[in-house]
């Protein structure tokens, strides 16, 4: 095992059976993601990006191959072990926020801290994401960008080692999307969190420390980007 790698995938494949048809969503994926990196996984719709994210996040187990997290093989975990792995180590950020509509922003964030052994201070988290005065507002009273910020706050409040972000700008306009990317980079740089962004939007790869391209379930590129671009200078 490479001690500098937080994630290491070794020949990982994932097949889904739909009736008599087998669909191979991942095919012999082998790559690593370094501790503290901001990685962008880039690929078109249906390329296997979400399957890969689910595998990294312990939401799904591979059909074959191994996934190592901090040198430990999580692909052999039981359901209970996977649940503990997700609770302790992973913060998820989704395209459509997935907030509880009947809870305020603060309550949505508090929900995540209830399952954490070492949660962050909620007022500090809300201030970090720029919503310290919006904690008592409900999702319906907030813009899409604000809701995504709450979703990010919920993800980091339980103090995970990793943020896994599935198309975090997909439902946002350009200006709001850039603000979300700036926030994710800030969390990566200032809090030391490993951030993995899944996206079909190619320009976003410019901000990454590592770029992973996936096509038809196969990893076709895994490279370091030695000169990441400030998200504020990225256009799409």
Residue ranges and their predicted role:
Residues 1-4, 235-236:
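Short, Lys/Arg-enriched, disordered terminal segments
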Residues 5-214, 219:
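ABC family nucleotide-binding domain
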Residues 218-236:
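Conserved beta-strand-loop-alpha-helix hinge in the C-terminal portion
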